[in-house]
C-alpha cells in the first residue's frame, strides 16, 4: 500500500468524511465497546449490514457524505466506505479510502472500499454489503475484500490509500441525484486517471 497523505490526515474530517457530525458521533458512541479491534469490527458490521447498497436495493437516493449515508441508511460502495472511515476516525482509528478497477460488462467500473490501521497493521476492508456470491467477514489480520481483481481481465487494485475521497469519485456522486439511473447509464467512474 502507498499513502497519499500524512499519518494525521487519516484521522481528519472533510466534507465527505464528516466524522464530527452528530449523527456519526452518535453511531460511533453506540458501537464503541472494547479495544480498537472490537470497535472496528462493530463499525464494519454496522455499515456492511445496516446500510443498504443502493444498487442492490434499487434505491434512487445518491448519498456521499458519511452523515447522510448513516442517516439515510443507503449508499453505493463509495458512500459506504465514506461512512465506515468516518466511524473509524470518530473512534480514533486511522483509516482511508481505497479503490479497485473491476470489469463491468464490456467496460470497467471503479469500486470503493476502505483501509484501516488496526493493531499496528493496515488492512483493507470492504463494507459494501453481502449478497449471493459476496460474503465479506471482518478481519484485523488480512484484507477482507468483496472482489479480487484479475489482471488478466484488465482489473486492478489501486495501491494508494487516500485520506479523502478521490475527486473523480466524489464529482460523480455529487453531480447525480438518481442512483439507479447513474448506475444503469454507465455514469460510475471507470478509472481514477
Whereabouts are the PLM-identified features?
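Generic marker of "main functional regions" within proteins
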Residues: 34, 53, 57, 61, ...
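Active-site neighborhood of thiol-dependent amide/isopeptide-bond enzymes
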Residues: 54-112
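His-Asp-centered catalytic microenvironments across diverse enzyme cores
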Residues: 2-7, 12-19, 98-193
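Secondary-structure boundary elements
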Residues: 2-72
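Residue-level signal for well-ordered alpha-helical scaffold segments within enzymatic catalytic domains
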Residues: 45-49, 86, 90, 116
Amino acid at each position: 500500500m502507498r499513502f497519499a497523505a500524512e499519518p494525521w490526515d487519516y484521522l481528519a474530517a472533510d466534507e465527505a468524511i464528516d466524522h464530527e457530525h452528530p449523527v456519526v458521533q452518535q453511531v460511533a458512541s453506540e458501537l464503541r465497546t472494547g479495544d480498537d479491534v472490537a470497535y472496528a469490527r462493530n463499525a464494519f458490521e454496522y455499515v456492511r449490514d445496516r446500510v443498504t447498497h443502493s444498487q442492490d436495493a434499487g434505491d434512487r437516493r445518491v448519498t456521499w457524505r458519511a452523515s447522510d449515508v448513516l442517516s439515510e441508511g443507503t449508499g453505493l460502495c463509495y458512500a459506504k466506505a465514506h461512512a465506515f472511515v468516518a466511524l473509524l476516525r470518530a473512534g480514533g482509528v486511522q483509516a482511508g479510502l481505497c479503490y479497485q478497477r473491476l470489469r463491468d460488462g464490456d467496460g470497467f467500473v471503479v469500486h470503493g472500499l476502505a483501509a484501516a490501521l488496526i493493531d499496528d497493521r493496515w488492512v483493507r476492508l470492504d463494507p459494501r454489503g453481502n449478497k449471493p456470491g459476496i460474503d465479506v467477514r471482518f478481519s484485523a489480520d488480512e484484507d477482507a475484500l468483496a472482489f479480487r481483481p484479475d489482471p488478466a481481465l484488465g482489473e486492478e487494485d489501486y495501491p494508494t490509500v487516500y485520506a479523502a475521497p478521490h475527486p473523480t469519485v466524489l464529482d460523480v456522486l455529487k453531480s447525480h441525484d438518481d442512483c439507479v439511473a447513474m448506475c444503469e447509464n454507465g455514469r460510475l467512474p471507470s478509472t481514477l486517471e
